[in-house]
Amino acid sequence: MQRSLDSLAGMATSAFGAGTSAAMRQATSPKTILQHIINFFTCGGIRRRNETQYQELIETMAETLKSSMSDRGAPLPENIILDDVDGCRVEFNLPGENNEAGQVIVRVSKGDNSETREIPLASFEKICRALLFRCEFSLPQDSVILTAQGGMNLKGAVLTGANLTAENLCDADLSGADLEGAILFMADCDGANFKGANLSGASLGDSNLTNACLEDSIMCGATLDRANLTGANLQHTSLLGCSMVECNCSGANMDHANVSGSTLIRADMSGATLKGATIMAAIMEGAVLTRANLQKASFTATNLDGADLSEANLRNTSFKDCTLTDLRTEDATMSTSTQTLFNVFYSENI
């Protein structure tokens, strides 16, 4: 029995003190030599049983929090009790009048026997909020609650049309998620992973996407006005028809992205890489592309009036039927054909 209590206490500590994939694997792996032997001859039976218990513990916690709190932003109860978890009582005592330790005290008991652990309050609260987030948006609970960086694990989540205004999604894993039409206005997505996600028609105005990964994502018709995409990864991203007015893409990797039909008026793309990017019928008036790498990028019928391409890499860059009035190209590196095109344009407009 004692080993059972110890195992459950360890699971509770891992799930609600860390919540990561590594913590889940450590908590559900066989511990003793006998368990390893049984696990081997049952083709992972011990691990599967532990994983089932781990998942049930998380689901019980989520339901308990949901029923005891008025909304996701409400203060957590000082005492959270999970009754009958595999015949045991699991209690979480938060810092307060009855707990001056500053940590969350976890107590697993059955009859006269008990096991006690401590977990950091900040981690516990973050994990509880993540569980409540899933409840609010009707997402099934996952045994991996947080990423290794401490963001929410929302991999493959269906959040179409969800209102995520000003949501904290820092370091969240939203790879493969469906966020079509979602509202992420002023959301903090610093370091978030949106690889392969569907963000078509999403509202991302004034959002923070610094160092976010948007590789291979679909963002057709999305609004990114004044969004901060500094250092973001937008390789092979479909940005067709996006509104990116005054968007900050400085230092972003936009190699092979398709920006056709987008509005990038006064966008800051300084130091960005757009190698092999497709830019057709885009509006880029006043865009800043200083020191940008535009090697082999293709500009067709694009308005570059007043854009700044000084010090940019324009080797083998194609400009066809583009508006180039007041374009700045000081110290830009370009192939002979591109230089000839600019010389002809400037001579015709003297």
Swiss-Prot record:
It comes from the Bacteria. InterPro entries: 5peptide_repeat (IPR001646), Pentapeptide-BTB/POZ_domain (IPR051082), PipB2_N (IPR048984). Keywords: Host membrane, Membrane, Repeat, Secreted, Virulence. Residues 162-201, 202-241, 247-286, 287-326 form the Pentapeptide repeat domain. GO terms for cellular component: extracellular region; host cell membrane; membrane. It holds the Pfam family Pentapeptide. Coiled coil: none annotated. It is found in: Secreted; Host membrane. SUPFAM superfamilies: Pentapeptide repeat-like (SSF141571). NCBIfam families: PRK15196.1. Interacts with the host kinesin light chain (KLC), a subunit of the kinesin-1 motor complex. Effector proteins function to alter host cell physiology and promote bacterial survival in host tissues. Involved in the reorganization of late endosome/lysosome (LE/Lys) compartments in mammalian cells. Necessary and sufficient to link kinesin-1 onto the Salmonella-containing vacuole (SCV) membrane. Required for centrifugal extension of lysosomal glycoprotein-rich membrane tubules, known as Salmonella-induced filaments (Sifs), away from the SCV and toward the cell periphery. Required for virulence, but not for intracellular survival and replication in phagocytic cells. Contains various tandem pentapeptide repeats in the C-terminal region. The pentapeptide motif is required to efficiently recruit kinesin-1. No position is completely conserved in these repeats, whose consensus sequence is A-[DN]-[FLM]-X-X. The C-terminal 38 amino acid residues are required for peripheral localization of PipB2 and redistribution of lysosomal-associated membrane protein (LAMP). The N-terminal 225 amino acid residues are sufficient for type III translocation and association with Sifs and SCVs, but not accumulation in peripheral vesicles. This is Secreted effector protein PipB2. It comes from Salmonella typhi.
